[in-house]
Amino acid sequence: MSQTLFIDGEWISAEKEQIRSIINPFNQEEIATVSEGGREDAIKAIAAARRAFDKGEWSSLSGLERGKIVLKIAELIRRDLEELAELESLDTGKTLEESKADMDDIANVFQYYAGLADKDGGEIISSPIPDSESKIIREPIGVCGQITPWNYPLLQASWKIAPALAAGNTIVMKPSEITPLTTIKVFKLMEEAGVPKGVANLVLGPGATVGDELAVNKDVDLISFTGGIETGKKIMRAASGNVKKIALELGGKNPNIVFKDADLEVAVDQALNAVFFHAGQVCSAGSRLLVEDAIHDQFLAELVKRAKRIKLGNGFHAETESGPLISAEHRAKVEKYVEIGIEEGAKLETGGKRPEDPELQNGFFYEPTIFSNCNSDMRIVQEEVFGPVLTVETFSSEEEVIELANDTIYGLAGAVWSKDIEKCERVAARLRMGTVWINDFHPYFAQAPWGGYKQSGFGRELGKIGLEEYTEVKHVYRNTKPAAVNWFNS
């Protein structure tokens, strides 16, 4: 599987012919080898995307015709859903059930943007100048560099690829170097669907070379990145030299607020799902639980009891509820944060260690972990752990919980639980976050925008605005009765 770079319509190996082994985090077995690209491969891919865009074969197609091809991609994803889901679970360790749901969502994203591709015919605006016409049009931005994370490899790729293509752009995609397999497969499907040569390019490789080139190269008009906050800051600095458009989604430290009048049985169940789904490796994970003090002890006891019963295991086994962490390095990071939490004075209620089950010893597993007695001064409350670690805080009033919920550098998502809907709406209105759920956690869909406030990033994916991110706005003015101005009498 060495020819895993797709540049200018051809599957090729990297120039330096370096190979990376892709492993299954459940058992550390090699599942594939891929060609590891470098800066020179990124430059080649950017040049191909630039030529394709400037040639205009894709951007000059009608929105209807582009939409047909994007819709074909959706249909091919549905055709190969089982294969894609199996690849995703092998690559990430997540359960097969989750991967199948992801693939269905991915197909829906492509279908949604296929439908939007021909919907923006511009806008005629009223001109204050006599004998003139004025219209606003949106045009494709050009060459788009796209960098995706390892936790939802193909889902995050779809949020970038589908709107970029629907809007008429060309792309250079860099998936995470450790989870590229489903992205490779979908580029084959895009080729099958009829995406023209040079329009969609794929370069595997590290962020330090391939990612950096996408940021600094003057022929890239936009860079979209989903990942960690420190890497996002590096991309901002690198891209500032040529003032390209940037879109960043940098994670969150998301509050899950439970008032005493909530449906506690449902709220406990959803709190578990909020933080332990996909072993907590979710940018929107509800890793900060804020519980009204009157119900704290009861809520915590039930939560801990349920967390201890979560079934870790092989994602291909039906009884498995959560898989491993992605790598040994990432597990070590999670373990370090647990040590920090204990040192800071948080009370470890459950977890905080690797499981003892002999069947799990070859994988990167970590037990669901809950800390109580937490406060906003703690690093485990402020920093994104990105693992199965929950911090629990208490509050006694609306004002207090709003202050606590907003007291991080992040602002991606949050949730409010109460039977008093007016109270939920009041709190939601004051949360500085891009998404707020009321009596639910985690739902997203193609029609609604996704993105964050503060250092969770800027720009939006999904929804109509997700398409607009990949466009430039142009004002076209026409004088219907041209005449001399006679400003200069000479």
Curated annotation (Swiss-Prot):
Span of the signal peptide: none
Enzyme type, top EC level:
oxidoreductase
Q: Where along the chain is the active site annotated?
A: E249, C283
Protein activity control: Activity is stimulated by low concentrations of salts and by moderate concentrations of glycine betaine. Highly tolerant to high ionic conditions. In vitro, activity is highly stimulated in the presence of proline.
Segments crossing the lipid bilayer: none
Hey, which pathway is this one from? Amine and polyamine biosynthesis; betaine biosynthesis via choline pathway; betaine from betaine aldehyde: step 1/1
Which Enzyme Commission number(s) are on file for it? 1.2.1.8
Q: Does the keyword NAD apply?
A: yes
Conditions for induction: By choline and by high osmolarity in the presence of choline. Repressed by GbsR.
Q: Does the keyword Cell inner membrane apply?
A: no
* Knockout or disruption consequences: Deletion of the gbsAB genes abolishes the choline-glycine betaine synthesis pathway and the ability of B.subtilis to deal effectively with high-osmolarity stress in choline- or glycine betaine aldehyde-containing medium. No effect on vanillin degradation.
Q: Which reaction does it catalyse?
A: betaine aldehyde + NAD(+) + H2O = glycine betaine + NADH + 2 H(+)
Which InterPro entries does the UniProt entry name for this protein? Ald_DH/histidinol_DH, Ald_DH_C, Ald_DH_CS_CYS, Ald_DH_CS_GLU, Ald_DH_N, Aldehyde_DH_dom, BADH
Q: Domain of life here?
A: Bacteria
What is recorded on activity versus pH?
Answer: Optimum pH is 8.0.
One of the record's GO molecular function terms: betaine-aldehyde dehydrogenase (NAD+) activity
Q: Where does NAD(+) bind?
A: K174, E177, G227, G228, I229, E230, T231, G232, E384
Where are the annotated coiled coils located?
A: none
Per UniProt, the keywords (alphabetical) are:
NAD, Oxidoreductase
- NCBIfam families in UniProt: BADH
Family to which this protein belongs:
Belongs to the aldehyde dehydrogenase family.
Its biological purpose is as follows:
Involved in the biosynthesis of the osmoprotectant glycine betaine from choline. Catalyzes the oxidation of betaine aldehyde to betaine. Shows specificity for betaine aldehyde as substrate. Can use both NAD(+) and NADP(+), but NAD(+) is strongly preferred.
How it assembles, according to the record, is: Homodimer.
Q: What is this protein called?
A: Betaine aldehyde dehydrogenase
The organism's taxonomy opens as: Bacteria, Bacillati, Bacillota, Bacilli, Bacillales
Designated gene of the protein: gbsA
